[in-house]
Amino acid sequence: MIYLFGASGHGLVILDILHRLNRPVQAFIDDADKPALFGGIPVIKSNELHLAASDELIISIGSNAARWKVAQKLAGSLFTSAIHPIAILSETVIVQDGSVVMAGAVLNPYAKVGQHCIINTGATIDHECELGDFVHISPNATLCGNVRVGNHSWVAAGAVVIPGVTIGKRAIVGAGAVVLKDVPDGAVVVGNPAHIKSENKWVM
């Protein structure tokens, strides 16, 4: 069975993917006050979770930082990925455990996606891109070829990153930004062309 950690809107999208793949979800896990059912699926507290060795998990939380914190608590668990049937992935693409790929996303040859990443609706990850762990590429964002994205970074909706650019760890690329040069670790960049606006102060 599969459990989804986080009864959220993002969780509903993952639930839909798994339903389309005929992979049954046993329950959402959420310690906040939630209804007994969410998306037609039971919601349980983490202290009610008793995993069998074969049970699988996906952390269904959009925030990179929150996803990382949950992953630390659940270290040693069996994580699985979910890839929408109308996403387009080259046969040479690597998507690691815990990551999700939404409808309409395109991942081209030799792209690599780390653990617990989100490749959101309609995002494009072009040839030979490499994404670290806990990365979120938002809807309709475009990474051109040979882009590198460091752990815990977020590329927001509609942003474009030109070929060969490196985005550092914990960086944030604002919605609609056009990134023409490398982005340092922890930088928040916005605009066209993208420029540094502030610092992402989240520290692991």
Q: Which residues does each PLM region occupy?
A:
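Hydrophobic, well-ordered beta-alpha structural blocks that scaffold small-molecule cofactor pockets
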Residues: M1-L51, S99
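Small/polar loops that bind or transfer phosphate-bearing groups
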Residues: G6, I58-G62, P163
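Generic structural signal for conserved hydrophobic packing positions in ordered secondary structure
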Residues: G6, L57, F79, D126-H127
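Short alpha-helical
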Residues: G9, A65-A66, V178
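Short amphipathic alpha-helical segments
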Residues: L15-I17, K69-K73, V113, P184-D185, ...
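Generic C-terminal helix-cap and adjacent flexible tail
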Residues: I196-M204
